[in-house]
């Protein structure tokens, strides 16, 4: 908060996963302390956690980030930074990377990650996909077509993706139209639709 920027939380089921270690780094030339990165408009962050699947020996690192919505250079450099972090990670574990990247699947930063030979786009490798509109909706329940898939999940080769889905649920509140008539208007909970995947580990089917 305040000058230290945002927080990219990782929610997990404590009945299924044990958190072993966690931390943050900032998407900037000074990753160990809060600060604007390159041409970014906001202070951006990546949160990580080392998890163990309870009842197994399988461990993995989960990264969750939020890239800047304005800075083109910031997004490109953030993609390079996260890949270097994963390559150099001391834990040497399977990894999952998710977040609001603010870049679509045609962007060079996206391709840098997906073509790295380390991480794979969950949408691309999923056995079953459900996605009928952009993940960015600008708070418009009707959505924005298919060009803005800017929220992504990437995984190392230690995982298979059984299902990939976009949750397009809306909620309704009572409002008044231009004629003074009460109507139920649809609203999205966020300006992004959440995406969800079902995965298996290649060594431990869970």
Mark where each language-model region is.
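Structured beta-strand-rich core segments of catalytic domains in phosphoester-bond hydrolases
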Residues: 1-59, 167
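N-terminal, active-site-proximal structural segment of metallo-dependent hydrolase catalytic domains
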Residues: 5-6, 58, 80, 200-206
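Conserved hydrophobic/aromatic beta-strand scaffold that supports enzyme active sites
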Residues: 8-10, 46-50, 64, 152-153, ...
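Short, glycine/acidic-enriched loop or turn micro-motifs at the edges of active sites
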Residues: 16, 67-69, 103
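Metal-dependent phosphoester/phosphodiester hydrolase catalytic core
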Residues: 41-43, 52-80, 89
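Hydrophobic/aromatic residues located in beta-strands of well-ordered beta-sheets
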Residues: 62, 95-97
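Active-site metal-binding loops of divalent metal-dependent hydrolases
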Residues: 65-67, 99-101, 193
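Metal-dependent phosphoester-hydrolase catalytic domains
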Residues: 73, 77, 86-95, 103-206
């Amino acid at each position: 908060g305040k000058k230290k920027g945002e927080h990219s939380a990782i929610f997990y089921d404590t009945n299924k996963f044990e958190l072993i270690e966690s931390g943050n780094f900032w998407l900037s030339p000074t990753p160990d302390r809060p600060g604007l990165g390159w041409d970014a408009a906001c202070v951006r962050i990546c949160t990580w956690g080392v998890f163990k699947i309870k009842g197994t020996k399988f461990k993995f690192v989960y990264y969750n980030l939020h890239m800047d919505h304005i800075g083109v250079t910031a997004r490109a450099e953030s993609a390079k930074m996260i890949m270097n972090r994963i390559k150099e990670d001391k834990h040497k574990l399977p990894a999952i990377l998710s977040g609001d990247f603010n870049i679509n699947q045609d962007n060079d930063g996206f391709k840098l990650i997906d073509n790295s030979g380390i991480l794979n786009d969950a949408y691309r490798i999923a056995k079953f996909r459900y996605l009928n509109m952009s993940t960015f909706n600008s708070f418009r329940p009707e959505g924005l077509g298919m060009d803005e898939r800017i929220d992504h999940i990437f995984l190392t080769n230690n995982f298979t993706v059984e299902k990939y889905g976009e949750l397009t649920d809306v909620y309704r509140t009572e409002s008044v139209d231009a004629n003074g008539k009460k109507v139920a208007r649809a609203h999205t909970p966020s300006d992004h639709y959440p995406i969800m995947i079902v995965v298996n580990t290649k060594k431990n089917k869970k």
